[in-house]
Amino acid sequence: MPWIQLKLNTTGANAEDLSDALMEAGSVSITFQDTHDTPVFEPLPGETRLWGDTDVIGLFDAETDMKAVVAQLEQHPLLGAGFAHKIEQLEDKDWEREWMDNFHPMRFGERLWICPSWRDVPDENAVNVMLDPGLAFGTGTHPTTSLCLQWLDGLDLNGKTVIDFGCGSGILAIAALKLGAAKAIGIDIDPQAIQASRDNAQRNGVSERLELYLPQDQPESMKADVVVANILAGPLRELAPLISVLPVSGGLLGLSGILASQAESVCEAYADLFALDPVVEKEEWCRITGRKN
């Protein structure tokens, strides 16, 4: 069905209040967008980090009386009569189908392909990971995921144990298993990610070699030959004491989800325990790898 979109411009400090006002006026969903396309880094736990100049966008059913919506919003103390706004009709699309149509098989390194589960594989002799990300992050399209997949493809994983810290869709853990790892362990704070990883592991025939845990359930003695963590710079710094103990002595560590401008601070958090390689960059993002001393 078609939708109507109403956009307001405000400050980050007022965005939450106007979001509530739009919901009270009948909006079925709210989106925050940066007016000037400025990067916003990860928030602290419990914090909603917003830009200084923020667009608040409400989505309304096509049958909504938008004149009545505007009249209601004019009563809000942050808006008032004649407040600036933009209303537009959105084209009726099958958004899920459009997304699926634009998700194509992708090659990473020499051996590895990530293929949507609804498409044919381009090379049956390659290492093919069939993926349906569901509600969890991780398709290989983001530079950080790509950097991690290329790194895994270049390793000799035969017989190794791999930990995917922040596993999302399970893409890295499953790729490691398909590349020869004997066992993979996925950890994520989101139960939906655990379920998506479980479904994708079953789709790829590696369920019996993949263990999945929420952080509070993971074994204390857990160790691996290779540890990969594609999360964000802040958590990578804060969790460095926890992540650093996961690789065995001489084990490998791969970190991403890091902007190139954040690489130095992340490297500092791991430099005491790891011999770090040169940082690899891709599209303003980077990957940090090293071997445990």
UniProtKB/Swiss-Prot annotation:
Keywords linked to the UniProt accession: Cytoplasm, Methyltransferase, S-adenosyl-L-methionine, Transferase
UniProt: S-adenosyl-L-methionine binding residues: T145, G166, D188, N230
Catalytic activity field: L-lysyl-[protein] + 3 S-adenosyl-L-methionine = N(6),N(6),N(6)-trimethyl-L-lysyl-[protein] + 3 S-adenosyl-L-homocysteine + 3 H(+)
Keyword GTP-binding attributed: no
CDD domains from the UniProt entry: AdoMet_MTases (cd02440)
Compartment annotation: Cytoplasm
Highest taxon in the source lineage: Bacteria
Function: Methylates ribosomal protein L11.
Record protein name field: Ribosomal protein L11 methyltransferase
Gene that specifies this protein: prmA
Gene3D superfamilies xref list: Vaccinia Virus protein VP39
EC number: 2.1.1.-
